[in-house]
Amino acid sequence: GDLNIAPLAEDVWSTKQLRNVVSHTDIERENLIAMQERGGWVDAVRDFFGADERLYSWWSYRARDYISSNRGRRLDHVWTSTDLAPQIQKVEIHSNTRGWKQPSDHVPISLQLG
């Protein structure tokens, strides 16, 4: 879902510059991670791609050069139960949709289970 929080350093283009910006503040990040842990949820996107890869699902409309600058944030999430997580076969962040005519600033994420 569109949670509008980027919990990890790898979920933003610059954790240093965005630390005090809404969507990446300490209180937002800590609370989202705590909610995920309390619910026993698995971050399907991170589970599939790994913790170290920079991943984004949002780019500002103000950045006309969003492709080359890649100053994005991962604000959209797919969580699964721990039982369902082993069935994740494919996760795609459809960044190409950001280039469509009149796109959203968020891009879809799809999950394939098997």
Q: What residue ranges belong to the model's regions?
A:
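Metal-dependent phosphoester-hydrolase catalytic domains
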Residues: L8-G114
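Active-site flanking residues adjacent to catalytic metal/cofactor-binding acidic residues
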Residues: G1-L3
